[in-house]
Amino acid sequence: LSSGYLLLEDISDDRCYEAWYAKTSPRLEALGIEVSHAISDRAKALIKLAVTGFECDSGADLFHAQQDLSRWLGPKLARQAATAEKQAIVAQTTEEKAPETATEAEQHDLKEQSLKARKDYDQAKQVQATYHENLQGISDAIHPFSLIDNSPNDAEKVEEGLENRAKAFEHLAGEQDISDKKDVMKKFRNQIKPLAVSVSFWWMWVSETLQGLAVDKDLEDWLTTTLLPVVYWHRQLHLTQNSRSREHYRKAWTQASHILNAHPFSATLPDSDIQRWLTWAEWMVRQFHRSSSAVEGRNGCLAQLYHNGRGLTPQRLRAL
C-alpha cells in the first residue's frame, strides 16, 4: 500500500493462482479493500489473480522489465569493454617498450595498433553508454508527466517511448552481434501495454477524484497541469537513489515550480485553499505505482536475509 503497510506475508512453495487467491481474498475482504489495479512481475498466476480474481487491470513491474534487458545485454557489453580495455593497455605498453633497434616501419605499426586498440575501447565504452541511456530511458518514459516539458503523459505516449527504446536495444544488439536466444525483446514488447497502463489508470483516478470534488474547469486545469507536476517530481526526487534519475527529476521539478509560481491562477487562491490542494496532490501522487514494492517478495526476502547474515530454513528454500 502507499502507506508501506503489507496486506499479507506468508511463506509458501505453492504459487499457483488458486493459492494466491485463497490467501489474498479473505484478507482484502476483511479490510474492505477492492483492488482496481495490480502490478506484478508478469507471473501467469499473478496476471490471472488480477484479471480473474480481482477483475482489474494487470500492470507490469518496471524493475523486472529492466532486469530482463540488463541480464541479456549488460554482462556481454561489460565483457566486451573489459576485453577492449586490456587490449588497449597491452598495445600501448608494447608501443612504449619497443626496442631501440625497431625500424621506423615497425614503430609505425606498433603506433597504429595502439591507436586502433584505443579506438576500439572508446567505441566499446560508447556502446555501454548508449545501453545505459536507453535502459534509463525506460524508467524516464513511465511517468504521468513528461520529463521534458511536464506535459501530461498518456498510455499512447508511454507506449511510443518504450517502443523506441526497444528498437534501440535491437539495433545495439545487432551491431554487437549479440543474439536474443531467450526472446527478451519479444517479452519486453509484450509488457509495453501493461507498463503503460499504470499511467492511464492513475490519470483516470485523478479525473474521477476531481469529478467527485466538483471542481470547475479552470481549477482542474491548474491542478492537473501546474500543481500536480511540482508535487509529483518533488516526491520522485526524494524517493530515488539513482543519481541520474535524481538529476532528471530535479530539473523537471525546478521547471514545474517556476511555472507554478508564474501562473496567474496561483495568485487568486487563498493560502488555505492552496494548502488544501497541496494535501490532495500529495495524497494523489502517492497513489502512482509502476513497480511492486522493493521490500516484498522473493527478491526482498533474499536481500534482507543476505544483509542480516541469516540462514535459509528448509521451508524458505522450498518457497524461494
PLM region descriptions:
Residues 53-92, 237, 244-295:
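Helix-centered, glycine/charged polyanion-binding patches within enzymatic domains
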Residues 8-13, 34-38, 283-290, 308-312:
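Conserved aromatic-histidine-acidic binding/catalytic patches
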Residues 128, 152-155, 159, 192, ...:
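Amphipathic, non-membrane alpha-helical segments in soluble helical-bundle scaffolds
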Residues 44, 67, 299:
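Short, glycine/acidic-enriched loop or turn micro-motifs at the edges of active sites
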Residues 287-317:
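Short amphipathic alpha-helical "interface-anchor" segments enriched in bulky aromatics
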Residues 1-38, 43-56, 60-62, 72-79, ...:
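RNase H-like nuclease fold core
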Residues 23-27, 184, 301:
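Short, hydrophobic/aromatic alpha-helical segments in well-folded domains
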Residues 137-281:
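Long, low-complexity, polar/charged, intrinsically disordered or flexibly structured peripheral segments
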